């Protein structure tokens, strides 16, 4: 299992955006004594995403992230939901030559997300 991990300047706002914009589901949120998100677990399209609050002294905060999420359902509707929640859609839903349909956007902190129906197979 591979679990992408993100660090956000405002992890509370990121969790709210991921729920509203992408339809992800909050599983657990652990806050530090200072009230910031130390660790959170989000259910995402049949998989998981972990996230926390960025810290200036952390070796993990090296820049923005990018991930492709395979979704079941209407890519165009997913794109519109994300856009309505504030995602910056920079590549509209497109049918790909290799199969599937997908789009790409940035969340409010600049991480790149692509959502689509293409899933690699072993066959």
Regions inferred by a protein language model and the residue ranges of each:
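Conserved beta-strand-loop-alpha-helix junction that forms the acyl-donor binding cleft
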Residues: 8-10
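Vicinal oxygen chelate
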Residues: 1-5, 15-108, 115-123
């Amino acid at each position: 299992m591979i679990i992408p991990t993100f660090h956000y300047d405002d992890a509370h706002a990121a969790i709210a955006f991921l729920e509203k914009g992408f339809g992800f589901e909050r599983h657990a949120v652990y806050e530090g004594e200072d009230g910031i998100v130390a660790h959170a677990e989000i259910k995402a399209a049949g998989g998981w995403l972990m996230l926390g609050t960025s810290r200036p002294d952390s070796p993990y905060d090296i820049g923005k992230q990018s991930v492709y999420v395979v979704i079941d359902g209407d890519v165009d509707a997913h794109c519109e939901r994300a856009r309505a929640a504030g995602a910056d859609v920079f590549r509209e839903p497109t049918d790909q030559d290799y199969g599937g349909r997908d789009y790409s956007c940035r969340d409010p902190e600049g991480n790149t997300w692509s959502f689509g129906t293409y899933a690699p197979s072993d066959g």
